[in-house]
Amino acid sequence: MWGRGLLLTDMNREFPPPRAAYAEAIVKPRLVLPPNAPGMPIGLFGGTFDPPHAAHRAACLLAMRRLGLDRVWWLVTPGNPLKDTKGLAPLASRVVAARKLAHHPRIDVTDLEAQLGTRYTYETVKYLVRRCPQVRFVWIMGADNLRSFHRWQRWRGITKLVPIAVVDRLGPSLYASAGVAGQALAYARVPETAAKTLPERTPPAWIYLHGLKSPLSSTALRAARALQR
């Protein structure tokens, strides 16, 4: 009888959740976000922006026009987990440079990831979707990123959180869609003629936007900058 009582007590006790559950339960700080409103289609454009260049701006303007986006948020990341961060310019200076280059009333340059303490795109997007559930977010990436998208942390999870717009780049467009992620997500590809519907679609959904053929690359610009030192 006594033993049963102990057993029932143990069964009813609220044991601590597993470690993974703790991670899910972390409450992020109440950050001040760029302008947004329920129903507003907003693009999310992440990168190190070291340095920012004209193709970044052109890609956002193309996506804004073709997808009917009200705003685009540039998420300047502290560092790319897939790239060597040695020699990376300080975050503050990259944010300043990005704001100077963007120079558009509907492009908001932020360091949200640094404020949130998130390292991966999945974590950042998940926070924003939960924080602003009625905003129609769209993730914007260059075609070169689609080629390596399968290497991103929880990349399939990202596709289930928001629609994705892939913007053409000179060169990568020839093979990006044939990569691992492009093939895996072929069933969810939206015709380019239906671009305006992308923000309203339930993910997974993605589109390839042709029209931008810029050879500019932050990696190449960094290499050129290093040679000049």
Where are these regions (language model features)?
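Nucleotidyltransferase catalytic core that binds NTPs
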Residues: 2-229
